[in-house]
Amino acid sequence: MQQKISVTGYNHYQERLRSLLTEENFYYTLSKAELFSIDYAGDVDPDEKIYRYEIAECSLRIQHDPVNAYDPAALKVFADGVHIGYVPRAEFYTLKRIAAQPDLRMRVDVYGGPYKVLEEKEPGADWMCEFDPKDYVLRKDEDPVRAIMIFEW
């Protein structure tokens, strides 16, 4: 079984989270024409974000933070030893239930940051028509880097 819990407070830890993203995504290095040519193989879908970095699978550690000014019951989340945020208060009970599972495996996945996406110049064109690179633009943007805790048993 698997349970996922998003890390909260990630906006305050963007620099730390970015430092965990180290593996470049091959598809991010490709040009519009190259992305378009591999789309036919089903590797890349138009309108799907192609992040610069692969998802980083990190070790997870959770630690009580009794001196937290906002919540003395706060639980810090660490990815590969780096403090990246907190367990949402609403998930404390879920986390307690998960912690009781035998053979519990846990990790934290870090994702997001710079991306590019192939977008139609005129959205809503007939999808049955042939794909044509000139009908698309390659737009770059950036999402906040986020983290999600993954528990499996």
Give, region by region, the residue ranges found by the protein language model.
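Conserved active-site motif detector
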Residues: 1-153
